[in-house]
Structure formats: structure tokens, C-alpha cells
Amino acid sequence: MPSTKALARRFLEETEHHDRLAAYDGLCTEDYREHDPAMPEETVDLAGARRIYQEVLTAFALRHTPESLIAEDDLVASRFTVRGRHVGAYQGFPPSGLTFEVGGQVTLRFVDRRIAEAWFNWDFDGALEQLRPPAAA
């Protein structure tokens, strides 16, 4: 049986791919809640998280790299790096092909070996700053 740390790593690595968004269903509880102040809706349920990630993954080719994972009781905390490339329209901005790399943290709460709640905090503004086209000379 995988540890909660292994499940957390799988969650971070698999939910970055369009064809693996179903990972939410297998890894999360039905009453899952996600908190992310960088997103348009700061707190969303499972369907909302999938909808937001679908929009983000249409605009960005992403790769999450968990840098560290610490587990205690029903919680797993991770420090991660997100790398991405702007490949599709996002919030009115056409795809630029530009890349970004930012850091973040997440704390996941498990119930019966499934993720019930996630608190994300990552440098979304830093990512958008890196995606701005260079200023005209």
C-alpha cells in the first residue's frame, strides 16, 4: 500500500496532464476542497478543481517537481517547482511560447488514504511576470 507521501507525489505529478485529470477521482475524496489564493476562485470543490486545471492545462504545458515531502499524521507538506510553457490562450492572452519556473508549497490533508483538502501557495504572479513579452526598445 503506497504511503501518503507517495500518494501526494502522484497527485502533484499526475494532475498536470490533460489525460490524467482523472487522477483527482482516484486520489481525492468526493467532498475534496482545494484552497489556492492564486486562482480565480480561492476555494473550490472537486469539480471546480478539475475545471480550473483543465483551463490551465489548455494554456500551459506544465511540469510539477516535488522538491521535498514531509508527512505527519494525516498531513503531507510539499515544496515544489512548477515549470511551464505558454501554449494556449489564457485570460485573454494569446499563446506566447514563453516559459516560466516558479516555486510553491502545498499541504494535503488525507482521510482514509485519499486527499480531502489541499492548500496551495505558489508564485502565480511570478509566472505571469516571466510570461510577459520583452518591452519594446
Features from the language model and the residues they span:
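C-terminal and inter-domain tail/linker signature
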Residues: M1-A137
